[in-house]
Amino acid sequence: MDQDAFILKEDSEVEREAPGGRESLSDVIGFLDAVLSSEPTDIGGDRSWLHNTINTPQGPGSAHRAKSEGEGEVSTPSTQDNRSGEESRVSGRTSKPEAEAHAGNLDKQNIHRAFGGRTGTNSVSQDLGDGGDSGILENPPNERGYPRSGIEDENREMAAHPDKRGEDQAEGLPEEVRGGTSLPDEGEGGASNNGRSMEPGSSHSARVTGVLVIPSPELEEAVLRRNKRRPTNSGSKPLTPATVPGTRSPPLNRYNSTGSPPGKPPSTQDEHINSGDTPAVRVKDRKPPIGTRSVSDCPANGRPIHPGLESDSTKKGHRREHIIYERDGYIVDESWCNPVCSRIRIIPRRELCVCKTCPKVCKLCRDDIQCMRPDPFCREIFRS
């Protein structure tokens, strides 16, 4: 009997709570429809209605329960507790849209602060428009009730009055970087401010533009004198006759040995050697190529002496030429005399005198018994 009574009481309690649950569900659905139908771009609008509590009628809050053991226990939850629970659920559902709206307001405020602190009057007028509706209200409400900072108010004032910055510059007042600390004095270096260098945030600063001045002609001349290039050494200096050891430079009032005064024909080598007016100039020897030797006129001990390449070839006479080759397993050395004035060829052969002053036969030619390569020149020498 007690169990049947308990079941009947529970059914009646469920029937009482069901209408209240349906009413709260319909209120939540209506609230969601209102949120979804609102304009998403209306960020700065009045949303004070979001903080209003939703009052829903509730049924009788007292319920009596009985246990099978016979002990009765009365539970009387108040209507205020039910309302607080429903308000917490509703606030939990609405916290996400409210947080998104507040984050959007903060982003707009940060953008407005950045435009007011880092751009000049021209960029502010372009970004905020010509005083029309740019999407940001002049004084958007603060949902959380936090006090606004002085920097934000100052930025709003500068955005509303863009001509104030130009007046400050015309009066020569020091300009501060919006949203940051003031610029250091001129005496301080860029390494101050606790190791952080401060750059000017505005391109219209009078302190920055005061550095870019037109230089005076005196400054330009000083810079040109300082930056004038020094004469660079293109290389080692050429050796002059005065610096060459063992030589003597001619006096300035004399003519060189190779030149001749005007009005005179060019002199020959013999005149230079015999003349006493010109300085003594050593004539470089003409060196024959390797493989040939010059011959002196004075043999020693009855044998011909073949001097080296340093012999003087200007003396008239003969030179001894040799050719060495192999024949039938033997090394053959052929030698003959040629006039000094004749050409020296790669393939040695007998040459005729060109200057017509060289002797036909010298002492070395007389010692030749036979001519290994007879030719008309050899026959003429031996006939004579």
UniProtKB/Swiss-Prot annotation:
Binding site for Zn(2+) 1: H318, C337, C362, C365
Region annotation (Disordered) ranges: 1-23, 38-318
Protein localization: Host cytoplasm
Binding site for Zn(2+) 2: C341, C353, C355, C358
Phosphoserine sites (modified residues): S68, S125, S192, S249, S257, S260
Highest taxon, organism lineage: Viruses
Pfam families: zf-Paramyx-P
One Gene Ontology biological process: symbiont-mediated suppression of host cytoplasmic pattern recognition receptor signaling pathway via inhibition of IRF3 activity
Assigned GO CC terms: host cell cytoplasm
Biased composition (Basic and acidic residues): 7-20, 83-101, 150-168
MF (Gene Ontology): metal ion binding
Compositionally biased residues, Polar residues: 50-59, 191-206
Keywords noted in UniProt: Host cytoplasm, Host-virus interaction, Inhibition of host innate immune response by virus, Inhibition of host IRF3 by virus, Inhibition of host MDA5 by virus, Inhibition of host RLR pathway by virus, Interferon antiviral system evasion, Metal-binding, Phosphoprotein, Viral immunoevasion, Zinc
Subunit structure: Interacts with host IFIH1/MDA5 and DHX58/LGP2. Interacts with host IRF3. Interacts with host RIGI regulatory protein (via CARDs domain) and host TRIM25 (via SPRY domain); these interactions prevent TRIM25-mediated ubiquitination of RIG-I and disrupts downstream RIG-I signaling.
Domain note: The C-terminal zinc-binding domain is involved in binding to IFIH1/MDA5. This domain is also involved in viral pathogenesis.
Role this protein plays: Plays an essential role in the inhibition of host immune response. Prevents the establishment of cellular antiviral state by blocking interferon-alpha/beta (IFN-alpha/beta) production and signaling pathway. Interacts with host IFIH1/MDA5 and DHX58/LGP2 to inhibit the transduction pathway involved in the activation of IFN-beta promoter, thus protecting the virus against cell antiviral state. Also interacts with and inhibits host IRF3. Blocks the type I interferon signaling pathway by disrupting the RIG-I signaling pathway.
Miscellaneous note of the record: The P/V/C gene has two overlapping open reading frames. One encodes the P/V/W proteins and the other the C/Y proteins.
Family: Belongs to the paramyxoviruses V protein family.
The protein's name in its UniProt record: Protein V
